[in-house]
């Protein structure tokens, strides 16, 4: 019974949210990011990829 290892994404907030639209702020918060240079690990699923794509100019993404 071989289980597939789920891949993860390391997402780091590198730009400030000051002056950003509310939709971008909500997307960052929904990813679990609350402050600058904070890193979270999320599952690599289409929903998370879509959220990251909307704020790609604010975050740094790495494969975990």
UniProtKB/Swiss-Prot annotation:
This protein's record includes keyword Ribonucleoprotein: yes
One GO CC term on file: cytosolic large ribosomal subunit
Name the Gene Ontology biological process terms: translation
Which residue spans traverse the membrane?
none
Q: Which residues form the signal peptide?
A: none
Task: Report the Pfam families cross-referenced here.
Answer: Ribosomal_L30
State whether keyword Repressor applies: no
> Which CDD domains does its entry note?
Ribosomal_L30
Q: Which UniProt keywords apply?
A: Ribonucleoprotein, Ribosomal protein
For this UniProt entry, the molecular function terms from Gene Ontology, in alphabetical order, are: structural constituent of ribosome
**HAMAP family given for it?**
Ribosomal_uL30_B (MF_01371_B)
Provide the assembly information: Part of the 50S ribosomal subunit.
Regarding protein family, the annotation reads: Belongs to the universal ribosomal protein uL30 family.
Name of protein: Large ribosomal subunit protein uL30
